[in-house]
Amino acid sequence: KAGPKGEWHCQPDNGTFELWFNGRNLFPDTGAYVYAGSAEVMKLRNWFRQTRVHNTLTLDGRNLETTQSVTGLWQPEGREQILVTENPGYKGLKHRRTVFFCRPGLFCNSGRSHRQCQRNREFELSFREGAVNVDAEKNMVTTAYEGPSNVKLQLFPEKARL
């Protein structure tokens, strides 16, 4: 969404994303509030800029420490379209997001963090308004929106929990 040179336009980027399908925003981003203003306006702006209120990874609930995001691969043509971004958002932790568009209507969004630690890593997601079903045994969330535009999200790591 922003990256190192444009972070003031949104929020410091750590692989933040939105997903639109069939004209519906399935994973809306909170965006940014305004550029400047009174103390009350700045309080709201700072709330919207927090890492934890965007579709991305956080460590111990903290804001990013660095915004050195890079695009590792952008392959928009061919049988599979692929986007890879990477950000060392926290000291000693690298976050890589890979999005594969496999066929019309099917994509895989893989968020990985590279670090051996006991610290709390959370993958923050904002679903659009509507029915969301949680299956804690399968580590799976599905949406039940009207129409064909829905989401199935499943966590695969052994220790991951919804």
Which residues does each PLM region occupy?
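Carbohydrate-active enzyme catalytic cores, enriched for enzymes
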Residues: 1-27, 76-77
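Cytochrome P450 core scaffold surrounding the K-helix E-X-X-R motif
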Residues: 27-30, 34-39
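Histidine-centered metal-chelating micro-motifs
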Residues: 6, 34, 45
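CBM-like, beta-strand-rich accessory domains located in the C-terminal region of large
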Residues: 38-162
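Pocket-edge structural micro-motifs
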Residues: 1-4, 21, 29-30, 61, ...
